[in-house]
Regions:
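Amphipathic alpha-helical interaction surfaces in cytosolic regulatory modules
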Residues: 21-97
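Short beta-strand/loop segment at the start of cytosolic alpha/beta domains
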Residues: 1-14
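Short, charged, intrinsically disordered terminal tails
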Residues: 98-120
């Protein structure tokens, strides 16, 4: 996996070909690290990913929750014909994420403010 810096305070994290029980932790550790470094927009690039199992989906949901709690954005670059896009559609999880056809499209999209919860 490689990280590719792009403008506008975002970073692209390339996901591996296959994400399953054995590889999910390593893949998503890079996403967490980017958010922990203060990057406000992290793009998970699934362009070359041809397989992901339920472990990968659970980790992705966890990263999404963590990003939202940190007032950051997780964007997914998933080509329209990708098997990953199909999995997200079948499971209904595609509605939980900001999906883009490429990392370039994800990077060019305007930042969507994450609502901050009021403090008591």
């Amino acid at each position: 996996m490689t990280d590719q810096a792009i403008p506008r305070a975002a970073i692209v994290v390339a996901m591996p070909d296959d994400i399953d029980y054995g590889t999910a932790d390593q893949a998503y550790r890079q996403l967490y690290a980017a958010f922990a470094a203060g990057i406000p927009v992290v793009i998970a690039d699934f362009t070359v990913t041809t397989y992901c199992d339920c472990t990968a989906l659970r980790r992705l949901l966890a990263v999404q929750s963590w990003a939202a709690a940190s007032h950051a954005e997780l964007r997914l670059a998933v080509p329209p014909t990708s098997p990953v896009r199909r999995i997200l559609q079948i499971t209904g999880l595609g509605q939980q994420f900001r999906l883009y056809p490429s990392a370039g499209h994800a990077a060019a999209a305007p930042r969507i403010p994450v609502p901050r919860s009021p403090r008591s």
